Amino acid sequence: MFFVKGEGFFYPLFIELRNLIRYQTTRVSNSSRDFNLSQQHCSCFRPKRRHEAHLSFIGTLQYSKQRTITRAASATIARRQLLLLFDITFSSSSSCYYFQKKAEKKLNRRRRFDTKYEDAADLLEKARDSYKLAKSWDQAGIAYLKLADCHLKANSLANTYMIMDECMDHEIAEYYESDEMFEQAIAYYETAAEFFQIEEVTTSANQCNLKVAQYASQLEQQSRFMKTQARHSLNNKLLKYGVKGHLLTAGMCHLCKADVVSITNALEKYQDLDPTFSGTRECKFLADLASAIDEEDIAKFTDVSKEIDSVSPLVWAVNHMQLFGCKLCLVLDHDNNVVEGKREVQGQGAGGGCKLYLIEGKCILDWNNVYTKRIYNYTNF
């Protein structure tokens, strides 16, 4: 049994329930035996007395039947209480042992057209999860191997590789993360997120994506992450309408690097990724803004910013950029005018709580009037 003799708060209750089940089960068996003996006893009488004994036997039988039903019900209730007690008192290791032993019994049975491998795989998955919760990593690894073997024998090789890849990619990413090799960690977290999305494990996929966003911001690869998000959204019917928003955010990350060639190449890639993006106002906005930055045309920069902000406020895109931990800081003079060095900056987009500034060929974003406060440091993306 799963209980150690004399140990545990629930041990006396367990013993009482176990004895009750044994007692009621024995009494049910005795009732059946009494029934058989009474029937044999009636056959020994003469016909007249046999009739009287038969009537007496019918009454006894009805009473015995009712008593048997009551005892069986008591035993059933006791079994349920015992199972509930198991659920309360099972430790993680006990449940692991239970699932693993049950899986082994499934594998040992021999029947034609049997689904023992599928049934054992379900039990081994529960054992694996229990071992992981108990942080018994060696036993969890053994459960993984047995699970893979079950899938192989059940002719589900693809499912086996999916399980192994899902596990290994996440663990490899954590290994690179611990060694501060963030570029490699990003690649494996992206792969793990894809597997989780295929299996519709949204929580785990979001955790992997947050890791990608965190390290992408440290490596100044925010645009890469937003492009990846756009690619995933294209494959989802419910999310495909948000693709242009992701690409807009990715393009604005390129703009903030003041690299016109980079944004031009990025726009070409975005159009290859989503052919409908070329006809959107977001694409036109990025192209016009890149041209204004390249020419250092403040008037054009202001007009383009006002035009897009009047139709679709940029706060959504900027808030997504803020998730990356990007710091947007400017230098203000005593009159709260934005300056770079000693040169006053003129020309800014207005409205929507989001403003764009052009400072010496660099695109700077301001949301919720953050620059009305006096900030004395300037940080690029």
Curated annotation (Swiss-Prot):
Keywords annotated in UniProt: ER-Golgi transport, Membrane, Protein transport, Transport
An example Gene Ontology biological process: vesicle-mediated transport
Protein name per its UniProtKB record: Alpha-soluble NSF attachment protein 1
Family according to the record: Belongs to the SNAP family.
InterPro entries: NSF_attach, TPR-like_helical_dom_sf
Topology term for the membrane: Peripheral membrane protein
Free-text function comment from the UniProt entry: Required for vesicular transport between the endoplasmic reticulum and the Golgi apparatus. Binds to SNARE complex and then recruits NSF to disassemble it.
The organism's place on the tree of life at top rank: Eukaryota
UniProt keyword Transport, yes or no: yes
Record's subcellular location: Membrane
Signal peptide (residue range): none
Lineage: Eukaryota, Viridiplantae, Streptophyta, Embryophyta, Tracheophyta
Organism per entry: Arabidopsis thaliana (Mouse-ear cress)
